[in-house]
Amino acid sequence: VETFIVCVVGVYVLRMVVMMLYAFSIRLPVFKFNKIERLSSILKYSLLIIIAGSIATIILDIDSFMLGLYIPIEEVAYYGVAIYIATVIVVPSRAMQQILQPLTAQYLNEKNKVALKDLYVRSSQTLFIIGGLIFLLIVLNINSLYETIPPQFSGGLIVVFLISMAKLYDCLMGCNNVVLFNSDYYRVVLIFGVILTILTIGLNMIFIPRYGINGSAQATFIAIAVYNTIKIYFVKRKFDMMPFTIDTGK
């Protein structure tokens, strides 16, 4: 275990060094200690974005915590393994959103609604295709995948399927979060996140005592589906655009 942790830390440090050297090769940083204008607004925006962006991760941690209150602790480990398997689906989405961040900010600043809508739709279609492929690979090979880990962790097939569906819905949203974070409506993401948290806790209290880890997965799936639907509807109302079209299902 200690060797594994050292290797993981080493990989992250190596990645940081490589990225730092590449960035320095393009342009060396210049340190200046000037007075920052509108510092309070910048700090407020940064704090809200950090909190709102952490909601999805916090939700999965809430699930694990609440499971420990209702079921044996070993079943929480089964749930954790299933969650990590399903989370692979959104890895391409996280990478693409970092790329889309400056483009989205540019189009919003220029009020270029045509380009923004095109980016919204294309990002949704691209991520849905990639996420859908990973989803199929996971679902079709889940039994073989569980054979590679200890048998005691092989529970949670339903959890993998439900959380994978929720993550696939995240992919279908395209750059929805990026649009909200870079617009004047970034505050509402935090409000939606609070609603999601309350909904998740309430559903977990109902489903976990009845269905165990499968109940927690059901609660998470319902909460994320409601959360994503609200955000899609909000962007539709404020920007008059949807992430998917008739061609999405083809």
Task: Label each region the model flagged.
Residues V18, G53-I62, G80-L103, L127-F128, ...:
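Small-residue-rich midsections of specific transmembrane alpha-helices
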Residues V1-S25, Y45, I195-L199, I213-F234:
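Hydrophobic alpha-helical transmembrane segments
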Residues L43, G80, T104, N112-N141, ...:
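Interfacial transmembrane-helix starts/ends
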Residues S40-I49, L67-T87, A115, S154-L157, ...:
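Interfacial/gating helices of multi-pass transporter permease domains
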Residues I73, I138-L168, G174, N214:
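Interfacial segments at transmembrane-helix termini and the short loops linking adjacent helices
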Residues V1-E2, S164-I195, V235-F239:
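Membrane-interface junctions at transmembrane-helix termini in multi-pass inner-membrane proteins
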Residues E2-I5, V17-L60, L103-D118, R237-G249:
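Interhelical loop/hinge segments that connect adjacent transmembrane helices in multipass membrane
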Residues A82, A86-S124, N177-N182:
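Helix-loop junctions and terminal segments of transmembrane helices
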